[in-house]
């Protein structure tokens, strides 16, 4: 079944104890969801933990096998390999824009076309956003391999190796046919079954036995692990392939490793002894332009260390500017024999290697390296692990895949950077064998750490099954977001910029420099208005990387780049980056990120209203969750500078900033004029946070200044925007000004995440916040697509989506998860889960966009920007649940509290 709670866990909320497990579990705790029933519902079928009809297993409906696999967990995303998604959407294109919006953006379109032509045809570079060549729909992706920042290789749910990010930030969406697992079964010295574990029917390697029957196999993903179960018809054998990647919260070493492990558990359900072999074949390179120059070669290796022997092949790919070595390896034991074929032609029929395996279940293992390839020639290799399998027995065959690309250059080829893992394994480009050995020795410990982290959530019966899948599987983007994690040399931190930030050097030098893309199609590192949403995952799981990112943003804030360029939306010529404003992004991987920021050139974001505010809010949130006083002290001058820059947007001095009559915030296609619910709310929240930070920093004059602004701004916000049911989109005279914006409570969301926003620290009247959230649920959720697709960005008061812009009638998945967190914070837990559930089921179960969650989709036909950063905001839901439980626990009598593990307070309350 798909994302379904086991029957033993289908119990009502009223029957559950309220308790919390607070041991160190890597950023997650078991929580008991309260108020999970709809007021209209009395039966248990509406509780989040109940396995309702939508969990009936449509993705598994084609499965005809009986095998359930070896130790496959009950929760996650599960799909039969024969499944076909009925709905086939297309990426958003110009022809999806309404005529009225097309007219509005005609000038921008012409400017973009001219810029695009120069970029692609003259400069021979790829645009940071390519509106003419969107990534097409491919409903194939599964869990990526590889830790954080060392590159990733995505393996599809049907077993194909199909999405590659080895060159930093640059993606190749290509299925490499030669990259396969093959099973060979032998009885009484004779091969009785040999099959490529793939549904493909390719035009190459035609001597191989392709076309696996997908009706007897399924895939199950719970990132960073995945399981594929194959029931081999007529053989009484079940294969379970477990894929493991070292994504380990609060671990800053193994989490950086460019490795993946495949553990094959083979179960013999028959009465005869079997000899079983699994062969792992891999092409050297992807078969594209990178390989065309030739010079690729393979060689065998064997590494014996600490009682463990690992044997396999090294695939050397010396193509500049980022050469690498891939290692395919298996563990050799007393019960497991490892053999190999150094080289075969992946574009041939493949007969030689197929017959080699067929003959005796092993490979010939020739000595020496292969001859380097000629121009246009390809080469592949294979590693085979073999074992004897007793009747009713089980054996385990262990493989690893590692890639060593220690030194990288971005597209401008201006600087050499060293990946994080080189700190632990060296940077000479010869550590692929050591990485393989380490992975095969350590993966059991990784799995223990993963289980300790995930089990408190998975074991919580009050949480819905879809949420358990979404919470962990959406984390794929932290590694597969074009992510880089780099070492920071001592001489790369200018003294004049970092001198006043005392923790800058130790943070960046101890924990490195972190960057992830806005999206795989929106190629800008650390896009800050979007990171605002996604950052919850980073600060909860790898807080030092969040602090590192914040220090980088602080450094960039004080820099300027006065190079003038034409902005595409307005046509205005203005500098790339002005001093004392937060940059939109840290740069394009096809250029030189960190050195040249603000790859985004649609708007001049120096005049955006949300970036500075989001920095202030995240600084305090990060301080509150980490308790790092030194960080807050370092960031305080930066917060003062960016808030001073923001003051100019309050033109009438009423304590509330005004938007500028264009799309001057993260909704960069949705015009906002005057005081607005979104930016005005963020402003008031940031002002409130400045008051709190001023108290902590002992700055009485600053405290008084922002307290006065807050008092005036609150009054103006309520007077200008509150209409009795919700906050108006903005205060202009335009028809869309009364639209119901799903993201109108973003400021309150962050305040609550920081332990503020109620009681003495209330900014927005609680009754108004709750009323607005109920209105959003009624109109943006329930009145949109039957309540089954999440919350539309904008809804008119009479229940029709706002189509005044290309973004107002979209659903933004990351915004919906943030909205759901806000609902949970305000006690609307059932509504929050119901709202978020619509997005999960739409993306993962209906549209087939697993492990490529888009920024946006419309009610029909289109999606936009696959594999996007913002949906990581689902971790804000987890934080809201944990804080809800903490609050409940703290309200108990002292004698009751004493029986539960103590909870650390978030954020010191005294002055620094």
From Swiss-Prot:
Record pathway: Lipid metabolism; sphingolipid metabolism; Steroid metabolism; cholesterol metabolism
Membrane topology: Peripheral membrane protein
GO CC list: cytosol; endoplasmic reticulum membrane; Golgi membrane; membrane
This protein's UniProt keywords: Cholesterol metabolism, Endoplasmic reticulum, Glycosidase, Glycosyltransferase, Golgi apparatus, Hydrolase, Lipid metabolism, Membrane, Sphingolipid metabolism, Steroid metabolism, Sterol metabolism, Transferase
InterPro entries named among the record's database cross-references: 6-hairpin_glycosidase_sf, 6hp_glycosidase-like_sf, B_Glucosidase_GBA2-typ, GH116_catalytic, GH116_N, Non-lysos_glucosylceramidase
Subcellular location: Endoplasmic reticulum membrane; Golgi apparatus membrane
Enzyme Commission number(s) from the entry: 3.2.1.45, 2.4.1.-, 3.2.1.-, 3.2.1.46
One GO-annotated biological process of the protein: regulation of membrane lipid distribution
Domain of life: Eukaryota
A Pfam family reported for this protein in Swiss-Prot or TrEMBL: DUF608
Catalytic activity of the protein: a beta-D-glucosyl-(1<->1')-N-acylsphing-4-enine + H2O = an N-acylsphing-4-enine + D-glucose; a beta-D-galactosyl-(1<->1')-N-acylsphing-4-enine + H2O = an N-acylsphing-4-enine + D-galactose; beta-D-glucosyl-(1->3)-O-lithocholate + H2O = lithocholate + D-glucose; beta-D-glucosyl-(1->3)-O-chenodeoxycholate + H2O = chenodeoxycholate + D-glucose
Recorded coiled-coil stretches: none
Annotated spans, Disordered: 886-912
Activation/inhibition comment: Enzymatic activity is dependent on membrane association and requires the presence of lipids.
Keyword Zinc-finger assigned: no
Polar residues composition-biased segments: 891-902
A molecular function (GO) term: beta-glucosidase activity
Primary role: Non-lysosomal glucosylceramidase that catalyzes the hydrolysis of glucosylceramides/GlcCers (such as beta-D-glucosyl-(1<->1')-N-acylsphing-4-enine) to free glucose and ceramides (such as N-acylsphing-4-enine). GlcCers are membrane glycosphingolipids that have a wide intracellular distribution. They are the main precursors of more complex glycosphingolipids that play a role in cellular growth, differentiation, adhesion, signaling, cytoskeletal dynamics and membrane properties.
Family named by the database record: Belongs to the non-lysosomal glucosylceramidase family.
Protein name as catalogued: Non-lysosomal glucosylceramidase
Originating species: Rattus norvegicus (Rat)
């Amino acid at each position: 079944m798909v994302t379904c709670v086991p029957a033993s866990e289908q119990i009502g909320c009223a029957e559950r104890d309220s308790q919390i497990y607070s041991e160190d579990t890597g950023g997650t705790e078991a929580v008991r969801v309260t108020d999970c029933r709809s007021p209209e519902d009395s039966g248990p079928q509406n509780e989040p933990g109940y396995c309702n009809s939508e969990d009936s297993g449509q993705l598994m409906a084609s499965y005809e096998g009986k095998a359930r696999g070896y130790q496959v967990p009950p929760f996650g995303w599960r799909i039969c390999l024969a499944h076909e998604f009925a709905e086939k959407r297309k990426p958003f294109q110009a022809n999806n824009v309404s005529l009225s919006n097309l007219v509005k953006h005609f000038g921008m379109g012409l400017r973009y076309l001219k810029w695009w032509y120069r970029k692609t045809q003259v400069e021979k570079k790829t645009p940071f956003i390519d509106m003419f060549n969107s990534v097409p729909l491919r409903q194939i992706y599964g869990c990526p391999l590889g830790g954080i920042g060392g590159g990733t290789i995505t393996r599809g749910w049907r077993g194909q190796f199909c999405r590659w990010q080895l060159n930093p930030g640059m993606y190749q969406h290509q299925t490499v046919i030669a990259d396969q697992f093959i099973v060979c079964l032998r009885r009484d010295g004779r091969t009785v079954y040999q099959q490529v574990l793939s549904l493909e029917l390719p035009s190459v390697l035609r001597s191989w036995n392709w076309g696996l029957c997908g009706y007897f196999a399924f895939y199950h993903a719970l990132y960073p692990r995945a399981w594929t179960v194959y029931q081999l018809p007529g053989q009484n054998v079940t294969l379970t392939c477990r894929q493991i990647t070292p994504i380990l919260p609060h671990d800053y070493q193994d989490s950086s490793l460019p490795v993946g492990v495949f553990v094959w558990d083979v179960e013999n359900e028959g009465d005869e002894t079997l000899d079983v072999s699994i062969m792992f074949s891999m092409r050297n390179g992807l078969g594209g332009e990178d390989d065309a120059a030739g010079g690729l070669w393979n060689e065998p290796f064997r590494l014996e260390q600490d009682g463990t022997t690992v044997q396999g092949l090294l695939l050397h790919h010396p193509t500049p500017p980022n050469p690498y070595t891939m290692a395919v390896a298996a563990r050799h034991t007393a019960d497991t024999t490892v053999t190999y074929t150094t080289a075969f032609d992946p574009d041939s029929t493949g007969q030689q290697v197929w017959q080699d395996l067929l003959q005796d279940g092993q490979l010939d293992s020739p000595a020496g390296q292969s001859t380097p390839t000629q121009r246009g020639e390809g080469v592949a290799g294979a590693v085979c692990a073999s074992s004897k399998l007793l009747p009713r027995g089980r054996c385990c065959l262990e493989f690893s895949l590692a890639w060593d690309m220690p030194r990288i250059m971005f597209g401008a080829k201006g600087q050499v950077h060293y990946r994080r893992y080189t700190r632990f394994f060296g940077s000479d480009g010869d550590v692929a064998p050591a990485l393989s050995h380490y992975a095969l020795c350590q993966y059991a410990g990784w799995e223990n750490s993963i289980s300790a982290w995930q089990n408190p959530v998975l074991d919580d019966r009050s949480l819905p099954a879809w949420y358990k899948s979404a919470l962990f599987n959406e984390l794929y983007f932290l590694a597969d977001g074009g992510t880089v994690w780099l070492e920071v040399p001592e001489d790369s931190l200018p003294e004049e910029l970092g001198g006043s930030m005392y923790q800058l050097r130790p943070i960046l030098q101890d924990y490195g420099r972190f960057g992830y893309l806005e999206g795989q199609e929106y190629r800008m590192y650390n896009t800050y208005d979007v990171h605002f949403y996604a950052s919850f995952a980073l600060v909860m799981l790898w807080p030092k990387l969040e602090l590192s990112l914040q220090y980088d943003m602080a450094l960039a804030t004080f820099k300027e780049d006065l190079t003038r360029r034409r902005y595409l939306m307005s046509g205005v010529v203005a500098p790339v980056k002005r001093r004392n404003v937060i940059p939109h992004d840290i740069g394009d991987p096809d250029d030189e990120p960190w050195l040249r920021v603000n790859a985004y050139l649609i708007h001049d974001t120096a005049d955006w209203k949300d970036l500075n505010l989001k920095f202030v809010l995240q600084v305090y949130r990060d301080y509150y969750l980490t308790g790092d006083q030194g960080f807050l002290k370092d960031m305080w001058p930066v917060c003062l500078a960016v808030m001073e820059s923001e003051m100019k947007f309050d033109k009438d001095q009423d304590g509330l900033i005004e938007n500028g009559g264009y799309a001057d915030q993260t909704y960069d296609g949705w015009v906002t004029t005057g005081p607005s619910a979104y930016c005005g709310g963020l402003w008031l929240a940031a002002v409130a946070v400045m008051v709190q930070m001023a108290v902590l920093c002992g700055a009485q004059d600053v405290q008084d200044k922002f307290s006065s602004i807050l008092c005036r701004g609150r009054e103006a916000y309520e007077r200008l925007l509150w209409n009795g049911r919700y906050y108006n989109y903005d205060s202009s005279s335009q028809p869309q000004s009364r639209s119901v914006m799903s993201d109108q409570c973003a400021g309150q969301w962050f305040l609550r995440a920081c332990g503020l926003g109620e009681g003495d620290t209330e900014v927005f009247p609680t009754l108004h916040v709750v009323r607005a959230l109920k209105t959003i649920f009624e109109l943006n959720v329930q009145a949109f697509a039957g309540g089954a697709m999440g919350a539309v960005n904008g809804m008119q008061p009479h229940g029709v989506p706002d189509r005044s812009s290309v973004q107002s009638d979209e659903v933004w998945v990351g915004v919906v998860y943030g909205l759901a967190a806000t609902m949970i914070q305000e006690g609307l837990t059932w509504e929050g889960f119901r709202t978020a559930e619509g997005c999960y089921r739409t993306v993962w179960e209906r549209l087939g966009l697993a492990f490529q969650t888009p920024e946006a989709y419309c009610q029909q036909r289109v999606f936009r920007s696959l594999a996007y950063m913002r949906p990581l905001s689902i971790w804000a839901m987890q934080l809201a649940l944990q804080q809800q439980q903490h609050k409940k626990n703290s309200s108990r009598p002292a004698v009751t509290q004493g029986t539960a593990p103590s909870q650390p307070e978030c954020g010191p309350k005294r002055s620094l």
